[in-house]
Amino acid sequence: MSALLNITEPNNNTNSNDNDFLASLTTDAPQAIASKYSREQIAQLFDLPLMDLLLQAQTIHRQNFNANEVQISTLLSIKTGNCPEDCGYCSQSGHHRDKTKLVAEKRIEVDKVIAAAKRAKATGSSRFCMGAAWKHPSAKDMPYVVELVKEVKALGLETCMTLGMLDTDQAAQLADAGLDYYNHNLDTSRSYYEQVVSTRSYDERLDTITNVRNSGINVCSGNIVGMGESRDDRIDWVHELLKMPKAPESIPVNLLVPIQGTPIGDKVLAEGQLSVLEWIRTIAVTRICCPSSYVRLSAGRESLSDAEQALAFMAGANSFFYGDKLLTTGNASQSGDDRLMRELGLTKQFAAPRAPKQVPVIDAMSGHQSQVVLAS
């Protein structure tokens, strides 16, 4: 594993322990140091000058992935609205339906889901994600979702589901069906969580993630940036990922889409939205701390410029949702995504990622030889 570029400079306001940590980014293999990150060290990463942070994140990204290849997923709502949870950002909550005016829909028939999966595969998605607005799937729902997993996998697609909380038996059923990923976001820090949701505890979210992990299904778990939380909350969220026995294989970093009629959406619309650059910082720190995870651009891309999305990829994102809709919110258009990928020189990942190619590079200033990873 290669060493990172040494970008630290003497700073009279930084103590020696801080300098030692930042210097370690230039000498330690990312996988070796990730589990050592303390909360204070994660905070130091957030505080780096943005260009330095992006350089570190992109270098680590290239050590673990093909830098110019992205994984494409498509997301379909298989049961929409009237959710019993009170998530303050979500239009699907039954608690907000009088204000959001979202029309609830029953479960989609299996054949219609399969038709959507076929369309997703034809346009280049390698993973098909299915979401249902439930607190948890009921016993009568399990045969339905198990059938969906089997039918979608038969098309040659990876499968992902987000259905709310799972107990150990439900996780085992989905694992037996062949489910590849299960999404259950932490959303934010433990301390800010009570400002977001009251009908499901933070520990219940962690319990579901544990049940998924123990079943052998890959974990997908991320956050929503821009709900009124502080940077400290974003630091705590990253630290929470590192407390897990293993970091999630897939980490969606959502940028809040404020929906009128939801408590958090109304608050953000009134007070102003978070800087996109802070979202990009969060992506970069996530990439550094979770070097082998896929970091996905999820909600919020529709409002971003090409340059902002390019910075997100520079920060280490290597996956995004493809399609004009994410559950009930808009998404960047497929034609726009195709054009952006062409302009950035990005290609779609259709199979298992190839091993990165390393080449020796001599630092002109020090004469030190290191390895730089090129796209294969």
From Swiss-Prot:
<keyword id="KW-0949">S-adenosyl-L-methionine</keyword>
<dbReference type="GO" id="GO:0009102">
    <property type="term" value="P:biotin biosynthetic process"/>
</dbReference>
<comment type="pathway">
    <text>Cofactor biosynthesis; biotin biosynthesis; biotin from 7,8-diaminononanoate: step 2/2.</text>
</comment>
<feature type="binding site">
    <location>
        <position position="160"/>
    </location>
    <ligand>
        <name>[2Fe-2S] cluster</name>
    </ligand>
</feature>
<keyword id="KW-0808">Transferase</keyword>
<dbReference type="GO" id="GO:0051539">
    <property type="term" value="F:4 iron, 4 sulfur cluster binding"/>
</dbReference>
<dbReference type="InterPro" id="IPR002684">
    <property type="entry name" value="Biotin_synth/BioAB"/>
</dbReference>
<keyword id="KW-0479">Metal-binding</keyword>
<keyword id="KW-0408">Iron</keyword>
<protein>
    <recommendedName>
        <fullName>Biotin synthase</fullName>
        <ecNumber>2.8.1.6</ecNumber>
    </recommendedName>
</protein>
<feature type="binding site">
    <location>
        <position position="296"/>
    </location>
    <ligand>
        <name>[2Fe-2S] cluster</name>
    </ligand>
</feature>
<comment type="function">
    <text>Catalyzes the conversion of dethiobiotin (DTB) to biotin by the insertion of a sulfur atom into dethiobiotin via a radical-based mechanism.</text>
</comment>
<feature type="domain" description="Radical SAM core">
    <location>
        <begin position="68"/>
        <end position="292"/>
    </location>
</feature>
<dbReference type="GO" id="GO:0051537">
    <property type="term" value="F:2 iron, 2 sulfur cluster binding"/>
</dbReference>
<feature type="binding site">
    <location>
        <position position="220"/>
    </location>
    <ligand>
        <name>[2Fe-2S] cluster</name>
    </ligand>
</feature>
<dbReference type="InterPro" id="IPR013785">
    <property type="entry name" value="Aldolase_TIM"/>
</dbReference>
<keyword id="KW-0411">Iron-sulfur</keyword>
<dbReference type="Pfam" id="PF06968">
    <property type="entry name" value="BATS"/>
</dbReference>
<feature type="binding site">
    <location>
        <position position="129"/>
    </location>
    <ligand>
        <name>[2Fe-2S] cluster</name>
    </ligand>
</feature>
<comment type="similarity">
    <text>Belongs to the radical SAM superfamily. Biotin synthase family.</text>
</comment>
<dbReference type="InterPro" id="IPR010722">
    <property type="entry name" value="BATS_dom"/>
</dbReference>
<keyword id="KW-0001">2Fe-2S</keyword>
<dbReference type="InterPro" id="IPR024177">
    <property type="entry name" value="Biotin_synthase"/>
</dbReference>
<dbReference type="Pfam" id="PF04055">
    <property type="entry name" value="Radical_SAM"/>
</dbReference>
<feature type="binding site">
    <location>
        <position position="83"/>
    </location>
    <ligand>
        <name>[4Fe-4S] cluster</name>
    </ligand>
</feature>
<keyword id="KW-0093">Biotin biosynthesis</keyword>
<dbReference type="GO" id="GO:0004076">
    <property type="term" value="F:biotin synthase activity"/>
</dbReference>
<dbReference type="GO" id="GO:0005506">
    <property type="term" value="F:iron ion binding"/>
</dbReference>
<feature type="binding site">
    <location>
        <position position="87"/>
    </location>
    <ligand>
        <name>[4Fe-4S] cluster</name>
    </ligand>
</feature>
<dbReference type="InterPro" id="IPR007197">
    <property type="entry name" value="rSAM"/>
</dbReference>
<keyword id="KW-0004">4Fe-4S</keyword>
<dbReference type="InterPro" id="IPR006638">
    <property type="entry name" value="Elp3/MiaA/NifB-like_rSAM"/>
</dbReference>
<comment type="subunit">
    <text>Homodimer.</text>
</comment>
<feature type="binding site">
    <location>
        <position position="90"/>
    </location>
    <ligand>
        <name>[4Fe-4S] cluster</name>
    </ligand>
</feature>
